A protein has these predicted regions:
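Helix-loop-helix
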Residues: 60-62, 159-173, 243, 247-307
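Alpha-helical transmembrane segments
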Residues: 37, 41-45, 73-74, 78-93, ...
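Membrane-embedded alpha-helices of multi-pass transport/permease systems
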Residues: 81-88, 92, 136, 143, ...
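An intracellular "coupling" helix at the cytosolic face of ABC transporter transmembrane type-1 domains
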Residues: 17, 22-25, 113-114, 130-139, ...
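Transmembrane alpha-helix boundary and packing residues in multipass membrane permease domains
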Residues: 46, 50, 54, 87, ...
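Short alpha-helical transmembrane interface motifs in multi-pass membrane proteins
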Residues: 33, 66, 70, 74, ...
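Membrane-integrated ABC transporters
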Residues: 1-41, 56-70, 85-89, 93, ...
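Transmembrane helices of ABC transporter permease
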Residues: 22, 26-39, 70, 74, ...
Length: 307
């Protein structure tokens, strides 16, 4: 993969899906699990809304046990499908990487000797090992989680608009700012991680070549020179990683601040509506919207962090 490659490039995605569809039944099961997790996760705060409005507020404590049992059942189903999703998504990712790595190594074996004279062995090792692990993480932790998160976000938005478009607006006011911050963070992290990958390849290449040619290094008394060269490469590698740390340090506090502002707006407007006897907004809906707002913003942070 080239330095400027995009993990979400359509052509690359189609090529990767060619490997995925070999395990189509596992893929279908993972996709179904992602959909069910989104439904169960969204159902939990809605059950809390029902508990507050239809039982606790009305003093129906005798029937409250049914809501608790339903919430426990929903929680158990969520945990079960999250386990199945995580296991089979990782299994699928490792199977895909296994196939790609075998094909890659066979391809490398077919290269002529002249290619190895021109190419750094360290870079080839980075592509065969590090880049393969990146692809594995795309499937096991990235791609399917992104699909599940997007489904959850769509479901959350639908529930919000269905229950109260007024309270939904208080969330949608903040949403463009968090989307803009997420996009800027995503662009910066993409550049930073490309730089990290490049520096990792340089580091691997340098170490491999010096260890292989250690006799020559010692023969020409270049220990001090090579040590200084290694320090420079290692310093570049450290600076590349520190860029990613810096971007994370900026973005995630901004995301948390946006979430807190959203919760404040929900409590302010929702509480004011309850006091003014607005029949559309109840205490249960306020609790529901607080949880839904967090469910809406959390996937954005995860998407930005992974891609």
């Amino acid at each position: 993969m080239s330095k400027n490659s995009n993990l979400l490039d359509v052509k690359l995605f189609k090529r990767l899906m060619g490997y995925v569809l070999i395990y189509k039944f596992t893929f279908i099961f993972v996709a179904i699990s992602a959909i069910l997790i989104s439904i169960f996760s969204t159902l939990t705060p809605y059950l809390i809304k029902i508990a507050v409005d239809d039982y606790l507020s009305l003093g129906r404590y005798d029937d409250f046990i049914f809501v608790i049992c339903f919430m426990l059942l929903n929680l158990v189903l969520t945990v079960i499908f999250m386990f199945l999703f995580s296991y089979y998504a990782n299994l699928l990712g490792q199977n895909v990487v296994y196939d790609i790595r075998i094909k890659l190594f066979k391809h490398i074996l077919d290269f002529k000797m002249g290619y190895f004279d021109k190419s750094s062995v360290g870079r080839l090792v980075t592509r065969a090992v590090n880049d393969m692990e990146t692809i594995a993480s795309i499937f096991s932790q990235g791609l399917f989680m992104i699909v599940a998160d997007l489904l959850q976000m769509l479901l959350v938005i639908f529930v919000m608009l269905f229950l109260s478009w007024k309270l939904s607006l208080t969330i949608f006011i903040v949403l463009p700012f968090i989307l803009f911050a997420t996009r800027q963070f995503q662009k910066s992290m993409k550049v930073a991680f490309n730089e990290v990958r490049s520096e990792v390849a340089n580091l691997n290449s340098f170490v491999q070549e010096r260890l292989t040619g250690m006799k020559i290094v010692q023969l020409f008394n270049r220990e001090k020179i090579e040590y200084e060269n290694f320090e420079k490469i290692n310093e570049k590698h450290k600076k590349a990683w520190l860029k990613t740390v810096w971007y994370n340090s900026i973005f995630f506090p901004i995301a948390e601040l946006s979430t807190s502002i959203t919760v404040g707006l929900i409590v302010w407007y929702g509480g004011l509506s309850v006091v003014l006897k607005d029949t559309e907004i109840t205490l249960g809906i306020i609790f529901l919207f607080i949880q839904l707002s967090q469910m809406l913003f959390r996937p954005l942070r995860q998407i930005a962090d992974k891609f």
